[in-house]
Amino acid sequence: VGRRDVLRDLVQTVARKKKSNCVLTGGSGVGKTAIAQGLAKLIVEGKVPDVIKNKTVWELDMTKLVAGTKYRGDFEERMKQLGEALQKQPDIILFIDEIHQIIGAGSTNQSMDAGNMLKPALASGKLKVIGATTDEEYRKVFEKETALARRFTKVSVDEPSVKDAKEVLKQT
C-alpha cells in the first residue's frame, strides 16, 4: 500500500542484466524491510517479470554471521560457505538489512571484509543483492566505498503519507 512506485523501481532494478543490485535508503522506520518483503510477495504471486519469477528472497543477518568469529579466518570461512550455498542455488536474491555493516565486517588488519568478498560475485552478476540502510549511513559509509557502491542502484524510500499509513493500518 502506497509503495507501488518504490516496488516498481525495485522490480525493474532486480530484473536488469547489469547493475541489478539495489540499495533502499531512507529514514529509520520508513518501511525499507517491508518493501523487500513486498518484493518476495510479488514473486510468490507471480506478479514480476519472467526473469525473476523463479527467484527466492533470502535475508542475511550480518550480526549472526559475524558473531563468534574470534579467530582469524573464522569469518572468511563462513563467508566462503555462504558463497558456496548461493552458487548452488543461483535463483536467490539476498536481502541485507543495514547493508552498510558489510563494509569492515569480519576484517582484521590483514583479512578481507564482507564487502570485498562479495564484490566479484556482484560484478559478474552471479549474485543479486537488495540492501537497506539509512540515508545517513549510506552517505557516511556505503557511498565512500565506491567500488562497492557503483554495483548498486540507489532507490530512495520516503515516509508514507498519512493516507497510506492509515491504509496500512486498516489492512493489518
Regions flagged by a language model, labelled:
Residues 1-172:
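AAA+ P-loop NTPase nucleotide-binding core of proteostasis motors
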